[in-house]
Amino acid sequence: MTNIRKTHPLFKIINDSLIDLPTPSSISSWWNFGSLLAVCLGIQILTGLFLAMHYTSDTATAFQSVTHICRDVNYGWLLRYMHANGASMFVICLFLHVGRGLYYGSYIYTETWNVGILLLFAVMATAFMGYVLPWGQMSFWGATVITNLLSAIPYIGTNLVEWIWGGFSVDKATLTRFFAFHFLLPFIIAALVMVHLLFLHETGSNNPTGIPSDADMIPFHPYHTIKDMLGALTMFLVLLMLVLFSPDLLGDPDNYIPANPLNTPPHIKPEWYFLFAYAILRSIPNKLGGVLALVLSILILALMPLLHTSKQRSMMFRPLSQCLFWLLVADLLTLTWIGGQPVEHPFIIIGQLASILYFSLVLVLMPLISIVENRLLKW
Protein backbone atom coordinates (compact mmCIF):
# COMPACT_ATOMS: atom_id res chain seq x y z
CA MET A 1 0.00 0.00 0.00
CA THR A 2 1.34 3.45 -0.93
CA ASN A 3 2.08 5.76 1.97
CA ILE A 4 -0.69 8.36 2.46
CA ARG A 5 1.83 11.16 2.83
CA LYS A 6 2.96 10.52 -0.77
CA THR A 7 -0.51 10.27 -2.33
CA HIS A 8 -2.84 12.60 -0.41
CA PRO A 9 -3.02 15.98 -2.26
CA LEU A 10 -2.36 18.05 0.89
CA PHE A 11 0.06 15.73 2.70
CA LYS A 12 2.02 15.35 -0.55
CA ILE A 13 2.84 19.09 -0.54
CA ILE A 14 3.97 18.93 3.11
CA ASN A 15 5.95 15.75 2.38
CA ASP A 16 7.76 17.30 -0.59
CA SER A 17 8.53 20.46 1.40
CA LEU A 18 9.51 19.14 4.83
CA ILE A 19 10.06 15.37 4.79
CA ASP A 20 11.36 13.90 1.51
CA LEU A 21 12.87 17.18 0.31
CA PRO A 22 16.36 16.47 -1.15
CA THR A 23 18.79 18.70 0.77
CA PRO A 24 22.56 19.22 0.31
CA SER A 25 24.40 17.12 2.90
CA SER A 26 26.99 19.85 3.49
CA ILE A 27 24.74 22.70 4.68
CA SER A 28 25.91 24.07 8.01
CA SER A 29 24.08 25.60 10.98
CA TRP A 30 23.92 28.89 9.06
CA TRP A 31 21.03 27.27 7.17
CA ASN A 32 19.06 26.90 10.44
CA PHE A 33 17.83 30.48 10.49
CA GLY A 34 15.06 29.94 7.93
CA SER A 35 13.31 27.47 10.24
CA LEU A 36 14.10 29.68 13.27
CA LEU A 37 12.36 32.58 11.50
CA ALA A 38 9.31 30.36 10.96
CA VAL A 39 9.34 29.53 14.70
CA CYS A 40 9.67 33.25 15.53
CA LEU A 41 6.76 34.12 13.25
CA GLY A 42 4.65 31.45 14.96
CA ILE A 43 5.54 32.78 18.43
CA GLN A 44 4.78 36.37 17.34
CA ILE A 45 1.41 35.51 15.80
CA LEU A 46 0.31 33.45 18.83
CA THR A 47 1.44 35.90 21.52
CA GLY A 48 0.17 38.82 19.42
CA LEU A 49 -3.25 37.21 19.06
CA PHE A 50 -3.64 36.84 22.85
CA LEU A 51 -2.33 40.37 23.45
CA ALA A 52 -4.85 41.76 20.93
CA MET A 53 -7.65 40.23 23.03
CA HIS A 54 -6.80 42.61 25.88
CA TYR A 55 -5.31 45.64 24.08
CA THR A 56 -7.37 48.73 23.18
CA SER A 57 -6.18 50.90 20.29
CA ASP A 58 -7.38 54.21 21.70
CA THR A 59 -5.03 57.01 22.77
CA ALA A 60 -6.88 57.40 26.07
CA THR A 61 -6.61 53.75 27.09
CA ALA A 62 -3.75 52.12 25.07
CA PHE A 63 -1.02 52.71 27.69
CA GLN A 64 -3.39 51.64 30.47
CA SER A 65 -4.41 48.48 28.60
CA VAL A 66 -0.74 47.41 28.30
CA THR A 67 -0.35 48.01 32.07
CA HIS A 68 -3.53 45.97 32.62
CA ILE A 69 -2.11 43.10 30.50
CA CYS A 70 1.09 43.06 32.58
CA ARG A 71 -0.60 43.33 35.99
CA ASP A 72 -4.06 41.76 35.80
CA VAL A 73 -4.13 39.24 32.93
CA ASN A 74 -2.98 35.68 33.76
CA TYR A 75 0.59 35.44 32.48
CA GLY A 76 0.00 38.71 30.62
CA TRP A 77 3.50 39.89 31.55
CA LEU A 78 4.88 36.73 29.90
CA LEU A 79 2.84 37.30 26.74
CA ARG A 80 3.90 40.94 26.52
CA TYR A 81 7.62 40.32 27.04
CA MET A 82 7.66 37.20 24.84
CA HIS A 83 6.15 39.35 22.09
CA ALA A 84 8.49 42.32 22.60
CA ASN A 85 11.68 40.25 22.93
CA GLY A 86 10.45 37.74 20.35
CA ALA A 87 10.55 40.63 17.87
CA SER A 88 14.22 41.19 18.74
CA MET A 89 14.99 37.49 18.26
CA PHE A 90 13.08 37.59 14.97
CA VAL A 91 15.20 40.46 13.65
CA ILE A 92 18.47 38.91 14.91
CA CYS A 93 17.61 35.70 13.00
CA LEU A 94 16.60 37.81 9.99
CA PHE A 95 19.91 39.67 9.90
CA LEU A 96 21.88 36.43 10.30
CA HIS A 97 19.78 34.82 7.54
CA VAL A 98 20.49 37.74 5.17
CA GLY A 99 24.17 37.73 6.18
CA ARG A 100 24.35 34.01 5.38
CA GLY A 101 22.79 34.73 1.97
CA LEU A 102 25.40 37.42 1.26
CA TYR A 103 28.35 35.30 2.40
CA TYR A 104 27.43 32.14 0.52
CA GLY A 105 26.03 33.82 -2.61
CA SER A 106 22.43 32.67 -2.08
CA TYR A 107 21.28 35.87 -3.85
CA ILE A 108 22.04 34.13 -7.17
CA TYR A 109 18.54 32.64 -6.77
CA THR A 110 17.05 36.03 -7.65
CA GLU A 111 13.35 35.19 -7.19
CA THR A 112 13.87 33.75 -3.71
CA TRP A 113 16.17 36.67 -2.83
CA ASN A 114 13.72 39.35 -4.03
CA VAL A 115 10.81 37.81 -2.11
CA GLY A 116 13.18 37.76 0.89
CA ILE A 117 13.76 41.52 0.50
CA LEU A 118 9.98 42.06 0.39
CA LEU A 119 9.72 40.00 3.58
CA LEU A 120 12.45 42.11 5.20
CA PHE A 121 10.54 45.33 4.42
CA ALA A 122 7.25 43.78 5.64
CA VAL A 123 8.84 42.67 8.94
CA MET A 124 10.44 46.10 9.46
CA ALA A 125 7.10 47.85 8.82
CA THR A 126 5.32 45.48 11.23
CA ALA A 127 7.97 45.98 13.93
CA PHE A 128 7.78 49.77 13.57
CA MET A 129 3.99 49.80 13.91
CA GLY A 130 4.16 47.43 16.88
CA TYR A 131 6.55 49.83 18.62
CA VAL A 132 3.89 52.56 18.43
CA LEU A 133 1.10 50.52 20.07
CA PRO A 134 2.07 50.77 23.80
CA TRP A 135 1.64 54.57 23.37
CA GLY A 136 4.59 55.54 25.54
CA GLN A 137 6.81 58.56 24.91
CA MET A 138 9.14 56.78 22.49
CA SER A 139 6.14 55.18 20.72
CA PHE A 140 4.56 58.57 20.06
CA TRP A 141 7.71 60.48 19.12
CA GLY A 142 9.15 57.58 17.12
CA ALA A 143 5.92 57.45 15.09
CA THR A 144 6.00 61.24 14.62
CA VAL A 145 9.63 61.35 13.46
CA ILE A 146 9.58 58.28 11.19
CA THR A 147 6.26 59.07 9.46
CA ASN A 148 7.40 62.69 9.06
CA LEU A 149 10.24 61.45 6.84
CA LEU A 150 7.69 60.94 4.06
CA SER A 151 7.17 64.72 3.96
CA ALA A 152 10.57 64.87 2.22
CA ILE A 153 8.93 63.45 -0.93
CA PRO A 154 8.55 66.41 -3.31
CA TYR A 155 5.08 67.83 -4.02
CA ILE A 156 2.94 65.08 -2.40
CA GLY A 157 4.98 64.64 0.83
CA THR A 158 2.91 66.75 3.25
CA ASN A 159 -0.43 65.40 1.97
CA LEU A 160 0.91 61.85 2.19
CA VAL A 161 1.98 62.27 5.83
CA GLU A 162 -1.39 63.76 6.84
CA TRP A 163 -3.16 60.95 4.98
CA ILE A 164 -1.14 58.34 6.93
CA TRP A 165 -1.74 60.19 10.22
CA GLY A 166 -5.48 60.57 9.55
CA GLY A 167 -5.22 64.17 10.78
CA PHE A 168 -2.70 66.93 11.39
CA SER A 169 -0.63 65.02 13.93
CA VAL A 170 -0.08 61.50 15.28
CA ASP A 171 -3.31 60.87 17.19
CA LYS A 172 -6.16 58.43 17.78
CA ALA A 173 -6.72 57.71 14.06
CA THR A 174 -3.01 56.92 13.61
CA LEU A 175 -2.93 54.50 16.55
CA THR A 176 -6.09 52.69 15.38
CA ARG A 177 -4.83 52.17 11.82
CA PHE A 178 -1.35 51.15 13.04
CA PHE A 179 -2.98 48.48 15.22
CA ALA A 180 -5.08 47.27 12.27
CA PHE A 181 -2.03 47.00 10.00
CA HIS A 182 0.14 45.51 12.74
CA PHE A 183 -2.46 42.76 13.15
CA LEU A 184 -2.84 42.18 9.40
CA LEU A 185 0.79 42.24 8.20
CA PRO A 186 2.03 39.05 9.95
CA PHE A 187 -0.51 37.04 7.93
CA ILE A 188 0.71 38.70 4.72
CA ILE A 189 4.25 37.83 5.88
CA ALA A 190 3.16 34.19 6.36
CA ALA A 191 1.80 34.17 2.78
CA LEU A 192 5.05 35.69 1.47
CA VAL A 193 6.99 32.99 3.35
CA MET A 194 5.06 30.38 1.33
CA VAL A 195 6.06 32.18 -1.90
CA HIS A 196 9.66 32.39 -0.64
CA LEU A 197 9.68 28.61 -0.06
CA LEU A 198 7.95 27.95 -3.38
CA PHE A 199 10.77 29.71 -5.25
CA LEU A 200 13.43 28.08 -3.06
CA HIS A 201 12.11 24.58 -3.78
CA GLU A 202 12.19 25.32 -7.52
CA THR A 203 15.99 25.52 -7.37
CA GLY A 204 16.86 23.64 -4.19
CA SER A 205 19.05 24.97 -1.39
CA ASN A 206 22.47 26.50 -1.91
CA ASN A 207 25.36 25.05 0.15
CA PRO A 208 28.54 26.45 1.77
CA THR A 209 30.77 25.58 -1.21
CA GLY A 210 28.49 27.26 -3.74
CA ILE A 211 29.01 24.24 -6.02
CA PRO A 212 25.91 22.33 -7.30
CA SER A 213 25.28 19.41 -4.94
CA ASP A 214 22.81 17.35 -6.99
CA ALA A 215 25.01 14.27 -6.57
CA ASP A 216 25.10 14.54 -2.77
CA MET A 217 21.60 15.00 -1.38
CA ILE A 218 19.98 13.65 1.79
CA PRO A 219 16.31 13.73 2.85
CA PHE A 220 15.29 16.73 4.95
CA HIS A 221 13.75 14.45 7.59
CA PRO A 222 15.22 13.23 9.93
CA TYR A 223 18.65 14.83 9.35
CA HIS A 224 17.74 18.49 9.12
CA THR A 225 14.55 18.36 11.18
CA ILE A 226 16.60 17.22 14.20
CA LYS A 227 19.15 19.95 13.50
CA ASP A 228 16.39 22.58 13.20
CA MET A 229 14.79 21.40 16.45
CA LEU A 230 18.11 21.84 18.25
CA GLY A 231 18.39 25.36 16.79
CA ALA A 232 14.82 26.19 17.84
CA LEU A 233 15.46 24.86 21.36
CA THR A 234 18.63 26.98 21.67
CA MET A 235 16.82 30.09 20.44
CA PHE A 236 13.89 29.44 22.78
CA LEU A 237 16.32 29.12 25.70
CA VAL A 238 17.96 32.47 24.83
CA LEU A 239 14.51 34.09 24.46
CA LEU A 240 13.34 32.72 27.83
CA MET A 241 16.55 33.92 29.52
CA LEU A 242 15.91 37.37 28.08
CA VAL A 243 12.21 37.41 29.01
CA LEU A 244 12.61 36.03 32.54
CA PHE A 245 15.82 37.77 33.65
CA SER A 246 16.03 41.10 31.81
CA PRO A 247 12.85 41.73 29.79
CA ASP A 248 13.56 45.46 29.37
CA LEU A 249 17.19 45.08 28.28
CA LEU A 250 16.43 45.90 24.63
CA GLY A 251 13.59 48.34 25.28
CA ASP A 252 13.63 52.07 25.97
CA PRO A 253 12.92 53.37 29.51
CA ASP A 254 11.10 56.38 28.00
CA ASN A 255 8.36 54.04 26.83
CA TYR A 256 7.23 53.61 30.45
CA ILE A 257 6.18 57.27 30.39
CA PRO A 258 2.72 57.77 28.79
CA ALA A 259 2.80 59.60 25.44
CA ASN A 260 2.79 63.38 25.82
CA PRO A 261 2.74 65.54 22.67
CA LEU A 262 3.86 68.57 24.74
CA ASN A 263 7.08 67.01 26.03
CA THR A 264 9.79 65.82 23.62
CA PRO A 265 12.26 63.19 24.93
CA PRO A 266 15.94 64.31 24.80
CA HIS A 267 16.94 61.52 22.37
CA ILE A 268 14.32 60.13 20.01
CA LYS A 269 15.45 56.79 18.63
CA PRO A 270 13.77 53.72 17.12
CA GLU A 271 14.17 50.12 18.30
CA TRP A 272 17.78 48.90 18.48
CA TYR A 273 17.52 46.88 15.27
CA PHE A 274 16.72 49.98 13.17
CA LEU A 275 19.59 52.03 14.59
CA PHE A 276 22.00 51.25 11.72
CA ALA A 277 19.53 52.66 9.16
CA TYR A 278 18.70 55.57 11.51
CA ALA A 279 22.44 56.41 11.74
CA ILE A 280 22.67 56.49 7.92
CA LEU A 281 19.59 58.75 7.82
CA ARG A 282 21.09 61.17 10.36
CA SER A 283 24.52 61.27 8.73
CA ILE A 284 23.18 63.21 5.72
CA PRO A 285 22.33 66.87 6.50
CA ASN A 286 19.66 67.03 3.76
CA LYS A 287 16.20 65.60 4.60
CA LEU A 288 15.39 64.05 1.20
CA GLY A 289 18.98 62.79 0.83
CA GLY A 290 18.76 61.16 4.26
CA VAL A 291 15.46 59.44 3.44
CA LEU A 292 16.85 58.14 0.12
CA ALA A 293 19.98 56.83 1.88
CA LEU A 294 17.76 55.17 4.52
CA VAL A 295 15.71 53.32 1.88
CA LEU A 296 18.79 52.47 -0.20
CA SER A 297 20.58 51.01 2.83
CA ILE A 298 18.07 48.12 2.67
CA LEU A 299 17.16 48.23 -1.04
CA ILE A 300 20.87 47.86 -1.91
CA LEU A 301 20.33 44.14 -1.23
CA ALA A 302 18.32 43.95 -4.48
CA LEU A 303 21.47 44.93 -6.39
CA MET A 304 23.54 42.05 -4.99
CA PRO A 305 22.90 39.65 -7.93
CA LEU A 306 24.01 42.43 -10.33
CA LEU A 307 27.10 43.30 -8.27
CA HIS A 308 28.34 39.69 -8.18
CA THR A 309 31.54 39.77 -10.29
CA SER A 310 33.27 36.68 -8.89
CA LYS A 311 33.55 33.43 -10.85
CA GLN A 312 32.85 31.61 -7.59
CA ARG A 313 29.45 31.76 -5.94
CA SER A 314 30.38 31.41 -2.27
CA MET A 315 32.94 33.35 -0.23
CA MET A 316 34.15 30.09 1.31
CA PHE A 317 37.34 30.03 -0.81
CA ARG A 318 37.73 33.82 -1.25
CA PRO A 319 39.79 35.20 1.66
CA LEU A 320 39.94 38.79 0.33
CA SER A 321 36.16 38.97 -0.03
CA GLN A 322 35.82 37.45 3.45
CA CYS A 323 37.88 40.33 4.90
CA LEU A 324 35.56 42.88 3.28
CA PHE A 325 32.46 40.96 4.38
CA TRP A 326 33.54 41.02 8.04
CA LEU A 327 34.50 44.70 7.65
CA LEU A 328 30.91 45.27 6.48
CA VAL A 329 29.60 43.45 9.59
CA ALA A 330 31.85 45.59 11.84
CA ASP A 331 30.65 48.71 9.99
CA LEU A 332 26.99 47.79 10.58
CA LEU A 333 27.70 47.26 14.30
CA THR A 334 29.40 50.69 14.39
CA LEU A 335 26.36 52.27 12.69
CA THR A 336 24.05 50.55 15.22
CA TRP A 337 26.10 52.05 18.09
CA ILE A 338 26.13 55.52 16.46
CA GLY A 339 22.35 55.43 15.89
CA GLY A 340 21.82 55.24 19.66
CA GLN A 341 24.16 58.17 20.43
CA PRO A 342 23.22 61.88 20.59
CA VAL A 343 23.85 64.06 17.52
CA GLU A 344 27.13 65.68 18.62
CA HIS A 345 30.86 65.49 18.00
CA PRO A 346 32.52 62.93 17.52
CA PHE A 347 29.45 60.76 16.79
CA ILE A 348 28.39 62.81 13.74
CA ILE A 349 31.66 62.32 11.85
CA ILE A 350 31.94 58.63 12.87
CA GLY A 351 28.40 58.07 11.54
CA GLN A 352 29.19 59.84 8.27
CA LEU A 353 32.40 57.85 7.74
CA ALA A 354 30.64 54.56 8.61
CA SER A 355 27.80 55.40 6.16
CA ILE A 356 30.27 56.17 3.34
CA LEU A 357 32.13 52.93 4.09
CA TYR A 358 28.86 50.93 4.05
CA PHE A 359 27.88 52.05 0.54
CA SER A 360 31.49 51.92 -0.73
CA LEU A 361 31.95 48.34 0.45
CA VAL A 362 28.79 47.02 -1.16
CA LEU A 363 28.78 49.05 -4.38
CA VAL A 364 32.50 49.39 -5.16
CA LEU A 365 35.02 47.50 -3.03
CA MET A 366 33.42 44.04 -2.91
CA PRO A 367 32.77 43.80 -6.70
CA LEU A 368 36.33 45.09 -7.36
CA ILE A 369 38.01 42.66 -4.96
CA SER A 370 36.06 39.80 -6.62
CA ILE A 371 37.58 40.78 -9.99
CA VAL A 372 41.03 40.86 -8.35
CA GLU A 373 40.44 37.34 -6.97
CA ASN A 374 39.44 36.13 -10.43
CA ARG A 375 42.70 37.54 -11.82
CA LEU A 376 44.75 35.93 -9.04
CA LEU A 377 43.22 32.56 -9.93
CA LYS A 378 43.94 33.30 -13.63
CA TRP A 379 40.20 33.04 -14.46
Swiss-Prot record:
Membrane topology label: Multi-pass membrane protein
Compartments (UniProt record): Mitochondrion inner membrane
UniProt-annotated binding residues for heme b b566: 97, 196
Transmembrane residue ranges: 33-53, 77-98, 113-133, 178-198, 226-246, 288-308, 320-340, 347-367
KW Ribosomal protein (keyword) present: no
Family: Belongs to the cytochrome b family.
Additional free-text comment from the UniProt record: Heme 1 (or BL or b562) is low-potential and absorbs at about 562 nm, and heme 2 (or BH or b566) is high-potential and absorbs at about 566 nm.
Protein name: Cytochrome b
The species this protein was found in: Eonycteris spelaea
